[in-house]
From Swiss-Prot:
Monomer. This is Protein pelota homolog. It is found in: Cytoplasm. It is an enzyme of class 3 (hydrolase). It comes from Pyrococcus horikoshii (strain ATCC 700860 / DSM 12428 / JCM 9974 / NBRC 100139 / OT-3).
C-alpha cells in the first residue's frame, strides 16, 4: 500500500492499493458512513428514440460513494464498496443512486472519514509498513504429497495441493521416476507462485528425511530456487504441518515481523494463563472490567467484533485501553488463533495483575 496524499483537515487520504493484503487491511479500515472516491465503470441506459429499446452503455466515471456495505472477496482479489453516489464527475450520472466500487490491486482510492480514530490511523501505517516486508511461502512435503501456503497479513492462504501416486518400494526404479516427476511438479509450482507473488523466501518442512531429498533435488535442478529455501522439521505433513511451522517460530526467523505468528502466540498465551489461573480476562464483561481497572497489558480483539453491531462499544474500549498504556492487537479470524479467540468471546486481556 502506498499513501499518495493526505488532507487531514478534510479527513481524506489518497491510497494506491498494491496487494491482496492491502485489500484486507482496507476491509478493516473502511466503515459505514465513510466516503470512497475512485475511478469506476457504471452502466448507463440510453434511449435513442421511443420506438427502440434502451441501449446500455458502460461509461468510465469518477464517483464518490457513501459506504453502506463492504465485502472482501479474497479469492477474486477484490474489495467491493457499496452505497449511494454523493459525487459524480459526469452530470448525466444521478446522485443518490446506488453503486459498487470494485477495489483491486492497482486501484487508487481516496478515503474520507469524519474522524480518523487512532485504530484506523495505526492500521493504515501498519498496512504501509507491511507492504515493505518480504512475503514467505510454506511448503510441507512427504511421500508423494505437498501442501503450499502463503503467509499473508490476515492468515494463511492455502494455494495448492499436489499429490502423486509413487507406487511400491522406495528404491524401485519406477518409483524413483515418479518421485522425480513429483519433485519437478512441486518445484515448478513453487517457482510460478513465488514469481507471481514476489516471494523471496520459502520454508520447506515435513517429517523424516523426505524434505532433504527434495532439497537435494532442488540444488541439482533448480539452484536459484534452492537458494531461497529454509528447511524445518515437523511431526506431520499437510496443513497440520504448516500450522506447526507457524507455532514453532520458524516464520519469525525468516520473516522477523510475522503478524500471524505473533497473533497465534498471544492467543496461546491467553489460553495458557487460563489453564494456570494466572492474570487474564476474556469475554466482554470481564475484559471491560479489567480495562477500567487499568489492569490490561495486552488487549486482544477479534477483527469480526469491529464489523459487528457492537463496533462502537469495542472501539471505545480499545481507545480507553490505549489511553491506559495497554497494547491493542486486532486478531484475524482467518487463522486458528482467531478461531480460539472467538471461542473465548472474541476479546481477551493479558493482565498486569489479578483483579479478583
Amino acid at each position: 500500500m502506498e499513501i499518495l496524499e493526505e488532507k487531514p483537515k478534510e479527513g481524506k487520504v489518497k491510497i494506491k492499493v498494491e496487494t491482496l493484503d492491502d485489500l484486507w487491511h482496507l476491509y478493516h479500515i473502511i466503515t459505514p458512513g465513510d466516503v470512497v472516491y475512485a475511478k469506476t465503470l457504471r452502466k448507463q441506459s440510453q434511449r435513442s428514440d421511443s420506438l427502440r429499446p434502451e441501449k446500455v452503455e458502460v461509461i468510465p466515471v469518477f464517483l464518490g460513494v457513501k459506504v453502506e456495505k463492504i465485502n472482501f472477496h479474497k479469492f477474486a482479489n477484490q474489495l467491493r464498496v457499496t452505497g449511494p453516489i454523493i459525487y459524480a464527475s459526469r452530470e448525466d450520472v444521478p446522485l443518490g443512486k446506488y453503486h459498487t466500487i470494485a477495489v483491486e490491486p492497482g486501484t487508487i482510492i481516496t478515503l474520507q472519514k469524519e474522524r480518523w480514530k487512532p485504530y484506523y490511523i495505526e492500521r493504515l501505517k501498519e498496512a504501509v509498513e507491511a507492504s515493505k516486508r518480504a512475503k514467505v511461502m510454506i511448503v510441507t512435503i512427504e511421500d508423494g504429497e505437498a501442501e503450499m501456503a502463503i503467509v499473508r497479513e490476515y492468515g494463511l492462504d492455502f494455494i495448492a495441493t499436489i499429490r502423486h501416486n509413487l507406487g511400491g518400494k522406495r528404491y524401485n526404479i519406477k518409483r524413483e521416476d515418479e518421485e522425480r516427476k513429483f519433485f519437478h511438479d512441486v518445484a515448478k509450482t513453487m517457482k510460478d507462485v513465488m514469481s507471481r507473488e514476489n516471494i523471496q523466501r520459502a520454508i520447506v518442512a515435513g517429517p523424516g528425511f523426505y524434505k532433504e531429498d527434495f532439497y537435494k533435488f532442488l540444488k541439482e535442478n533448480y539452484p536459484d530456487l534452492a537458494s531461497k529455501i529454509v528447511l524445518d522439521d515437523t511431526s506431520m505433513g499437510g496443513r497440520v504441518g504448516i500450522y506447526e511451522v507457524i507455532k514453532r517460530g520458524t516464520v519469525d526467523k525468516v520473516y522477523s515481523e510475522s503478524r500471524i505468528a505473533n497473533e497465534i502466540k498471544l492467543v496461546e498465551k491467553v489460553i495458557e494463563r487460563i489453564a494456570k489461573d494466572e492474570p487474564v480476562a476474556y469475554g466482554m464483561k470481564e475484559v471491560e472490567e479489567a480495562v477500567n481497572y487499568g489492569a490490561v497489558e495486552i488487549l486482544l480483539v477479534l477483527d469480526e467484533l469491529l464489523k459487528g453491531d457492537n463496533r462502537e462499544k469495542v472501539e471505545e474500549l480499545m481507545e480507553l485501553a490505549r489511553s491506559l498504556r495497554s497494547k491493542v492487537v486486532v486478531v484475524s479470524s482467518e487463522h486458528e488463533g482467531g478461531e480460539k479467540l472467538k471461542a473465548l468471546g472474541g476479546i481477551a486481556g493479558i493482565l498486569r495483575f489479578k483483579i479478583k
